[in-house]
Regions:
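Hydrophobic small-molecule pocket/channel-lining residues, especially in calycin-type beta-barrels
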Residues: 1-154
Length: 154
């Protein structure tokens, strides 16, 4: 089952579930994210659904090619009530997104995020937020494939 030409570099992640622990997670307060990647809209899109700590927070992303802007674009909707719109590029096994945030209560207006597509099939994500006019470190997570993990919402 094929993806559109512009999404093909992400083909190996389709149909897989990944689980990752946040870099700032502790044994007393573990924080982990589960995400599931799937083919959508007859292969013209990828849908990524994720949840943190079984639904404390979560969201859904759609990634597609936009011929008008000649770029991958995405939309991300969250359980916290905000959403992002992004342009994305794939370079050197990295998916890099530049996101505009709407409706965030913490003063975050932009996000720069990178997903490293590691040669062993794992993922590494890192983000930065433009919060109250300053760039600050966001989250960092290393994911491993976890076929039995489930994305859960409350």
């Amino acid at each position: 089952v094929e993806l559109s030409e512009h999404l093909k570099p992400l083909q190996s992640y389709i149909g897989k579930t990944f689980k990752g622990e946040f870099a700032n997670s502790t044994p007393e307060n573990p924080t982990y994210d589960i995400q599931y990647w799937e083919r959508a809209l007859n292969g013209s899109a990828i849908k990524i659904t994720h949840s943190v700590n079984n639904g404390e927070y979560g969201g859904e992303s759609m990634i597609m090619w936009d011929a008008k802007v000649e770029s991958l674009v995405s939309w991300y909707f969250t359980t916290a009530g905000f959403y992002t719109q992004a342009t994305m590029i794939i370079e050197n096994d990295k998916l890099v997104s530049y996101e505009k945030v709407t409706g965030n209560e913490n003063g975050i207006t932009k996000v720069r995020a990178t997903i490293n597509l590691l040669s062993n099939g794992e993922l590494h994500t890192k983000s930065e937020y433009l919060q109250n006019g300053k760039w600050v470190d966001g989250h960092e997570i290393y994911y491993k494939e976890a076929p039995n993990a489930k994305v859960l919402f409350k």
